Amino acid sequence: MASSTPSSSATSSNAGPDPNTTNLRPTTYDTWCGVAHGCTRKLGLKICGFLQRTNSLEEKSRLVSAFKERQSSKNLLSCENSDRDGRFRRTETDFSNLFARDLLPAKNGEEQTVQFLLEVVDILLNYVRKTFDRSTKVLDFHHPHQLLEGMEGFNLELSDHPESLEQILVDCRDTLKYGVRTGHPRFFNQLSTGLDIIGLAGEWLTSTANTNMFTYEIAPVFVLMEQITLKKMREIVGWSNKDGDGIFSPGGAISNMYSIMAARYKYFPEVKTKGMAAVPKLVLFTSEHSHYSIKKAGAALGFGTDNVILIKCNERGKIIPADLEAKILEAKQKGYIPLYVNATAGTTVYGAFDPIQEIADICEKYNLWLHVDAAWGGGLLMSRKHRHKLSGIERADSVTWNPHKMMGVLLQCSAILVKEKGILQGCNQMCAGYLFQPDKQYDVSYDTGDKAIQCGRHVDIFKFWLMWKAKGTVGFENQINKCLELAEYLYAKIKNREEFEMVFDGEPEHTNVCFWYIPQSLRGVPDSPERREKLHRVAPKIKALMMESGTTMVGYQPQGDKANFFRMVISNPAATQSDIDFLIEEIERLGQDL
């Protein structure tokens, strides 16, 4: 509201008396506060704020009248909604004698349902609050056998008879207690981190709606949201807004599989009906640093992992284009048909961006399908400062982009984008008559489910759409820029310190910062197999101590012939420089006696 003074229409004599406001003439400050506290939170705060700024009873009365009129015109909850207040007020409830059968749709089950869900919401809100509290642990680690044996009454076994709602609430608390707070500002273990509150609200709504994404008939709003969002993502990639297709999938591995299926169908459509026996020997190409899902898709789709050819990378983890072309020519000489090249925009370990422009030139030269796996790096397309790292992505035939990684959307949220419209539909449709009837009363082109390899499909779009509405493209851009700035901060802090050693030279391209912690016993020791063997054991030991203490989490792994090293990744917008400082200090503390 721009001004505390209501418009003339709210007080005009022509409007007549408002039956909802004519009795709002309290004569004391306390009475006015009572009115404010009886309203919805947003409205109540506005009224309380006004009361502190003015002593005019006339103005107070006019303000409340105007607020109530505005709320009513927008069909929002008003101060008079006592029915809502009564139904959703917490009351003392004995859940030890209540069971699932006592909740809706049970007769007279509304009150028990409301009280049970209020308790669940209280558990969830307490968890959310603690997630952002740096004094809380990232995890309370227990070994598998401890959880299986039961921790303080937390029993994972299933029973034949129902347990009380009291026990169900305890189970909810314990499930969160013994899990990992992946939204904690000091959780750096995976590419998917953070806990976005808008996204959380979206996921709650999605679960409440409990619908499926196969037809417009049962998910009209969600289907339209998905189409609009996918179109926007394709435009950001750089394709014409009239071109292309796409769908949300259960994750980047499945999105990558879609890309291989689309490529195969594009060049050999007969494979859909006749199978792999009807097509030549096909080979796929991907970098030695690419995600393992490409090889997994090769196995699942009948190519065989031997026919997924790995391309050499340079010291920064980028494809060497000359080796790609050499491997293509070698395959052709052996009688194979090169089909598909996967370029990675943001590798899992190094965060490297393959040279897409050069790879695209080779694909055009030999008529190969070019896919860009931007599951991790796709978020940088939202940043004007960093999108140049994906230069050439607009030349790709398909793109994998996981908003649940760099953009902080809650799991799961992965998109496969395809430049040519119709390929996904042609490749996957089976025209199931009980779902995809052609004679429905609406435009059946909105029944998008038949282009998916699934039948049932979770609604992944709403939380993402809602976050985009709440943040705007600029909000995502700022969030991504901040994470990359934190990676630069970490690199600058440790690159010249004797207790740390960088895995490769130069600033990281993404938020992946790869380094060894060098304990005192290995500092100044010349490189040798014995030193590498000892160094290989350092990161796992520190990680074990880290998990036992529960203070932070960061991943480690080997790469090629390199000893285990820490791979720090930042995708949580809640993280700050102080969290980076804490991580460095914690690694030093835990590793000082190794």
UniProtKB/Swiss-Prot annotation:
Which UniProt key words apply to this protein?
Decarboxylase, Lyase, Neurotransmitter biosynthesis, Phosphoprotein, Pyridoxal phosphate
Q: Indicate which residues the UniProt annotation says bind 4-aminobutanoate.
A: Q190, L191, S192, R567
- Cross-referenced Pfam families: Pyridoxal_deC
Q: Which cofactor does it need?
A: pyridoxal 5'-phosphate
Residues annotated with Phosphoserine modification: S78
Reactions mediated catalytically: L-glutamate + H(+) = 4-aminobutanoate + CO2
Q: Name one GO cellular component term.
A: presynaptic active zone
Could you tell me where the Low complexity compositional bias lies?
1-13
Task: Tell me, in a sentence or two, what this protein's role is.
Answer: Catalyzes the synthesis of the inhibitory neurotransmitter gamma-aminobutyric acid (GABA) with pyridoxal 5'-phosphate as cofactor.
Q: How does it assemble?
A: Homodimer.
Name the chain's protein. Answer: Glutamate decarboxylase 1
The taxonomy runs:
Eukaryota, Metazoa, Chordata, Craniata, Vertebrata
In the UniProt record, what gene is named as encoding this protein?
A: GAD1
